[in-house]
Amino acid sequence: MDWVDAKPMKKYIADNLSRPSALESLARAFLEMTRELHEQGISHGDLQHGNILVRPDGSLVLVDYDSLYVLGMDGIPDDIKGLQGYQHPARIHQRYRSAYSDFFSELVIYTSIRTLAKHPGLWNKYSLADTETMLFTEKDIQSGGTSEIFRLIESDRDIRYLGRAIKDALRQPSLDRIVPLQDIVKGQADSVVENLSKQWLSQSYQPSAFQSNIDIFNQLAEIASRW
């Protein structure tokens, strides 16, 4: 394997806790990577901080392909179940590798990045530098969404939808019932735009003479892109 000039994701996060914009950019890069994997029907199978590297330009590199799934690999046993704290309880019962193997891990990782961007103090509070997870522990996952970290996330209006999405995923009996990350984020963005549009209409908002409908649409799209 070629040498890659990149940092492990957790190291990158630790180095950028004082730069929330860098962590938000990391979250967007991760979201885009997962979208591309989904489009190709690919799953890594052991998605966690140690298997994701961040290049100096912010692009991501996946390593350790022992549990990889691509289209046409149906029927191959799912022997590597992934790191605890990243895996859905149903993963242990999955017999074969599948395109759905990463759905829960992706949601956990994205939520962790977004949460640390908003609340960097959690890094020291939970001594995350010394853990084998990024934010959620195995006990957090086993709690079904009732642990302290879930309460903290749901107290933040910008990211509470992610905590609720994890809780909803934990209620699902199998990985194929979990909503893909890009659909969760898009659903939230669409909701934000819809609510803003309703507020503007209810307040009889009138754009200035120099604003076109395209300008307004672009403003809404920019707001949505931040989610």
Please place each PLM-identified region on the residue numbering.
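Conserved activation segment of eukaryotic-like protein kinases, specifically the C-terminal portion
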Residues: 76-91
